[in-house]
Amino acid sequence: MPVYWYSIPAQIKGVIDRMFSFVVGGKNIAGKECAIIACCEEAEMDVMDGVRIPLERSAALMKWDMVGEVLVPGVLNAGDIAKTDGCAQAAALAEKF
């Protein structure tokens, strides 16, 4: 997912809101596996905190197992991701599921 203005994109926030209804409704959704794959334009990794922290906390609330994270900074233009090991990291993370 892209990082927009140091936060989660609205589409992902909508998913979190809908999943939260299961929690407050008492539905047992524990034990799922999840991961974070995100990129941003800036070079500083702390820019990812606005995405990483809410997703980690949401996973903890739902009692999901965070399998891993791939956070790739410095990705602005088309093709920039190819200059990183982000795709290889994402492929390795996918193997954990």
Q: Residue locations for each model-derived region?
A:
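Helix-loop-strand module that forms the ligand-binding subsite of alpha/beta enzymes
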Residues: 1-62
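Glycine-rich phosphate/pyrophosphate-binding loop and the adjoining helix
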Residues: 49, 53, 57-97
